[in-house]
């Protein structure tokens, strides 16, 4: 049963006004500064979000408790963002300062990159369950597709050497777009009126999309995303001002919500096939990377990747329609 229409709309339209527009621009500017600061300062990227957990009494007993974390999803979201983000900060410190010790060495191990991968998977899965709970099964299917197409670790993730120790993930432009439109559709119908923040979600997703483009480093998308989301969740948890300063409650339309999910699903299906083909042929090594990251990778590993791609093409060419090798391939 579709329940978002009854849960997400108070019945009082909230038109887009100049106050909403200015509030969104100011929020975007604040998010931009936070993302840029966190990207270049590994230590604060751990301590700020770790200490933010100490505000939890306000989540439970504060003046905004009735308009903040009022359902299981919001509680799961804030905890699955702040706690892991603190550990990601420790990973960056371990790489930036090259500290000694077993724990620091573990945090620097490339295989530990499976941790942020798993957290991203978890965050998408949480929203996917919420989509299914509210009745938008099309958009829930998109969430599942996004989980399945997160680029693998540590092949397409790394913490770059240097004092900034940036966490980068080589996601594709199509994946970023699908994630953005899926998340917006989810936020459009996934929250009750006292907790709604669709306009604010537009801000955090817009900054995550635009920041890497301005920096001409597409691999910073995940990093920008992980540092915009906790800001949103903390505001909601402590005192949710979004329904007042940038109201969007009355924007909801049930038909738009469902059609939006269907369109997202239609875009996801071909991407799943393309993503699988990229991995199978070895083209993902190059095509998932863009800009300078691709140039650097090709310069270091281009010959090896070409050999892998040639091997994949030759294996496809020497197999008959029944999957058996031809005579020439067995000599």
What function would you assign to each model-found segment?
Residues 21-31, 77-95, 115-123, 142-155, ...:
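Hydrophobic cores of alpha-helical transmembrane segments in multi-pass inner/ER membrane proteins
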Residues 68-76, 133-140, 250-260:
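Non-cytosolic membrane-interface motifs at loop->transmembrane helix junctions
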Residues 102-219, 225:
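Generic multipass alpha-helical transmembrane bundles of integral membrane proteins
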Residues 50-67, 88-91, 116-132, 173-189, ...:
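Hydrophobic alpha-helical transmembrane segments and adjacent interfacial helices
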Residues 16-36, 48-96:
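Transmembrane-helix bundle segments that line or gate the permeation/cavity pathway
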Residues 311-331:
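Long, low-complexity, intrinsically disordered segments
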Residues 1-17:
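Short, strongly hydrophobic alpha-helical membrane anchors
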Residues 24-33, 197-317:
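C-terminal transmembrane-bundle signature of multipass membrane proteins
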């Amino acid at each position: 049963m579709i329940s978002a229409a009854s849960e997400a709309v108070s019945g009082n339209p909230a038109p887009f006004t100049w106050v909403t527009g200015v509030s969104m621009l100011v929020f975007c500017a604040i998010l931009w500064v936070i993302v840029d600061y966190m990207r270049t300062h590994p230590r604060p990227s751990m301590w700020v979000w770790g200490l933010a957990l100490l505000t939890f009494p306000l989540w439970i007993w504060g003046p905004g408790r009735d308009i903040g974390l009022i359902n299981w999803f919001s509680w799961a979201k804030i905890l699955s963002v702040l706690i892991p983000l603190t550990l990601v900060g420790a990973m960056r410190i371990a790489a930036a300062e090259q500290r000694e010790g077993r724990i620091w060495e573990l945090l620097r191990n490339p295989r530990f990159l499976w941790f942020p991968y798993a957290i991203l998977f978890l965050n998408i899965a949480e929203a996917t369950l919420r989509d299914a709970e509210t009745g938008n099964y099309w958009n829930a299917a998109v969430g599942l597709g996004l989980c399945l197409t997160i680029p693998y670790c540590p092949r397409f993730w790394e913490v770059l050497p240097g004092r900034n120790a940036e966490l980068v993930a080589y996601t594709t432009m199509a994946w970023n777009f699908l994630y953005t439109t899926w998340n917006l559709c989810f936020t459009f119908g996934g929250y009750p009126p006292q907790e709604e923040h669709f306009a604010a979600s537009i801000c955090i997703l817009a900054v995550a999309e635009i920041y890497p483009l301005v920096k001409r480093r597409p691999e910073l998308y995940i990093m920008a995303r992980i540092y915009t989301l906790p800001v949103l969740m903390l505001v909601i948890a402590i005192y949710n001002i979004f329904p007042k300063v940038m109201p969007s409650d009355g924007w909801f339309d049930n038909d738009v919500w469902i059609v939006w999910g269907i369109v997202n699903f239609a875009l996801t299906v071909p991407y799943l096939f393309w993503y699988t083909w990229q991995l199978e042929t070895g083209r993902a090594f190059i095509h998932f990377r863009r800009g300078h990251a691709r140039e650097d990778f090709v310069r270091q590993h281009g010959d090896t990747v070409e050999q892998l791609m040639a091997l994949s093409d030759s294996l496809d060419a020497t197999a008959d329609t029944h999957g058996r090798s031809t005579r020439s391939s067995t000599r």
